[in-house]
Amino acid sequence: MKIRCFCIVLIVSGALLTEVNNNRSLSGDNLLVVNNLQSSK
């Protein structure tokens, strides 16, 4: 179950990052958030 949830999180975060890449002014902040989430796990 945890692996499945983790895969879903990766897919959703990937989709969000692709949308964020369109708005490059926000990409830096969101990358920091993603890095913090990965390091917390």
Curated annotation (Swiss-Prot):
Q: Which residues form a coiled coil?
A: none
Q: Where in the cell is it found?
A: Cell inner membrane
Q: Where are the transmembrane segments?
A: 1-17
Q: Give GO cellular component annotations, separated by semicolons.
A: plasma membrane
- On the tree of life, the source organism's domain of life is Bacteria
Q: Does the keyword Cell membrane apply?
A: yes
Q: Which UniProt keywords apply?
A: Cell inner membrane, Cell membrane, Membrane, Toxin-antitoxin system, Transmembrane
Q: How does it sit in the membrane?
A: Single-pass membrane protein
Grouped into one coarse class, the protein's main location is: membrane
What family is it from? Belongs to the TimP toxin family.
| Chain's role | Putative toxic component of a potential type I toxin-antitoxin (TA) system. Neutralized by sRNA antitoxin TimR which binds to the 5' UTR of timP mRNA and inhibits translation. The antitoxin gene is encoded immediately upstream and transcribed divergently from the toxin gene; antitoxin RNA is less stable than timP mRNA.
Name listed for the protein in its UniProt record = Putative toxic protein TimP
Q: From what organism does this protein derive?
A: Escherichia coli (strain K12)
Q: Which gene encodes it?
A: timP
